[in-house]
Structures are given as C-alpha cells and as structure tokens.
C-alpha cells in the first residue's frame, strides 16, 4: 500500500459512519454459517459454504446463497439473533455508529414453522445486545421479496403492523427486479404508508429502466431509494430527485456493473462516478459485505480511489446518510454536528 493510500486508510478507520443499505443474510460470517448448518443438520456442506465466499471477476449475485440459508440452514430464531449481533459487532469495529438493515422474512417463514414475531423479536434482541456491548444503534427494515406474490408482500406488512415495534421503522423491497416492477407491491406500500411506516425500495439496480425509479417515487411514494443507477438516463427525473432531496443508497461493489462492464472501464463508466457530480444525494454502503468481500472502510475507499471523489465528498456522503436515515430529527441534528466535528478533527490530524 502506498503512503497516500495508507494515510487515506488510517483516516477512514477513524471517521464515524452510518450504514443504510445492508442485507442481514449478506453479513453472515463463514464460520457462523458452518456452525448453523451443522447445528441444524443442514444438507449444506462446508465446501459449498466455502464457495459462497469466493467472488469471481464477473460475480453472479448472492440470491442463491440467501435461498440456501432460507430453505436449508436457518431453523431457529436464535440463528437470526446471532447473525444480527455479529453483523453489528463487525460494523462497530469499523466505526459504524448506526445501521439500518434489511431482513427478508417471507422466505424463512415459508420454509420453516417459525413465526414472524419470534424471528423479529430474536433480531431485536441481537440489536439490543450489540448496542449494550458495542454502542452501535440500529433499526430493522423488513423487506419484500419481489419474487414472491403481491399478496405475500402485503402479508409481510400486515405482520409488521400486528407486531409493531419502534425499532422496526419501515419497509424495503429487494431481490430480482427484472419482471418484478415496483407497482406489483403497490398495495403493500399503501398499507405501510397508511400505518406510518417509512419506505424505501431497490430500483434501477440491474440495468432496468429509469421508469422503475420513477414508479417507486410516484406509485409507492418512497422516502428514499436504493441503487437507482438508471435515474441518470432521464435528466428530468434527476432534477426531480435533486429538488426533492431524496437520498439514494449506492453500492460500489454492485454485482451487475462488475459483471457487465470491463475491468478496464468499470471505474470510469460506473454510474456512481456521475451521480453525486450530477447533484444527486448519495450515500455508499456495503450491501452484502460477507459475499462482496467488502467492509465499510473499503467501501469508502472505493469512492475515492475508484470513482474519484474527494475527502470533502466523503463528509457530504456521511451527512447525507444521517439526513436520509430514519432516526428522530433531533438525534440526526445532534449527530450531524458531533460527527462533523469528529470528521474535521481526524482530517486535521491525519492529512
């Protein structure tokens, strides 16, 4: 590592961070997956699990891993408590102070006899334990599996409303976007908004049309957007996002662009390079850190080294994340002031 890179890395280790786009099942440690597979008598072998943690130059995504977890490995509420606790432990070591993370309940509910309330409560226990042990706060975002039926999405929101908890603040929507447009789950989003839940959605992730981003805004009425890279294909929609100040959570290690762009052109052609420069409010995230082979520090470093953003930009991204988070407004305001002071102090100390 060069001296400049070493200096940047030291700085990134110290600055406060927030994570808003991370999937719980995408955080599971390799040894934890092996432990759970053995404990639960899963068909999944150690060799198969080892292969999950190898990422090729043209990655195919992680959904097959999530399906293996849902269908064959996860068998007890405590499995999810452990995964949540360990994710937050790992994040806190990277100076992540607050995390809002996705959990897809539909697959596990379909594959087991476990109840929604038992699973949600187990994750909340893990979150509380992590806050006690590491000081990291967190909020849970149950997320619609867009490969499931519209009725399954609505049922998920109904379960959230039945088992309402203040740390379960809103809904998301993820998994395969192709042939599963946002409007498929309009009823689920309408109920969420009527019930006072926050909303976000993956859209424009897999090279799909900017119309999915527009639909997420117009039909679903989302409070923030995840990925949304193809918004750049419609200048009027870009202007609208800027005017609304809507936060877009982006992922430097996104599989689609690693797979479809050449290694030589990836950093120059990736939409993330253009998004903030176009005036969009973005915040970088790890998505599935265990399988993307990334962590919050590396994620921030990629924004500088791959996409050419500056230290000033990193501060803007940090503040964007706080502003777009689902923390209480007073908390956001206080943290923005505190974190800005910390950021500036570390900058003066290291650079």
Predicted regions: what is each one?
Residues 2-197, 205-211, 219, 224, ...:
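Metal-cofactor-binding active-site regions of metalloenzymes
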